[in-house]
Amino acid sequence: MLISLGWAALAATFTFSIAMVVWGRNGDGSINF
């Protein structure tokens, strides 16, 4: 259970970071890194 929860959190973080990079490269001025 705990391991599955950890993998789910890791996948969510990875997906979120990828989405941030994609949105950042789309020229959206509201998100700047």
Curated annotation (Swiss-Prot):
Keyword Membrane: yes
Main location: membrane
Membrane topology of the entry: Single-pass membrane protein
Entry's Gene Ontology molecular function annotations: electron transporter, transferring electrons within cytochrome b6/f complex of photosystem II activity
Annotated keywords: Electron transport, Membrane, Photosynthesis, Thylakoid, Transmembrane, Transmembrane helix, Transport
GO cellular component, one term: plasma membrane-derived thylakoid membrane
Entries under InterPro entries matching the protein: Cytochr_b6-f_cplx_su8_sf (IPR036143), Cytochrome_b6-f_cplx_su8 (IPR005497)
Location within or outside the cell: Cellular thylakoid membrane
TM annotation in the entry: 2-22
Electron transport is among the record's keywords: yes
GO biological process: cytochrome complex assembly; photosynthesis
Disulfide bond entries: none
Record's subunit section: The 4 large subunits of the cytochrome b6-f complex are cytochrome b6, subunit IV (17 kDa polypeptide, PetD), cytochrome f and the Rieske protein, while the 4 small subunits are PetG, PetL, PetM and PetN. The complex functions as a dimer.
Protein's job: Component of the cytochrome b6-f complex, which mediates electron transfer between photosystem II (PSII) and photosystem I (PSI), cyclic electron flow around PSI, and state transitions.
Family, as annotated: Belongs to the PetN family.
Entry protein name: Cytochrome b6-f complex subunit 8
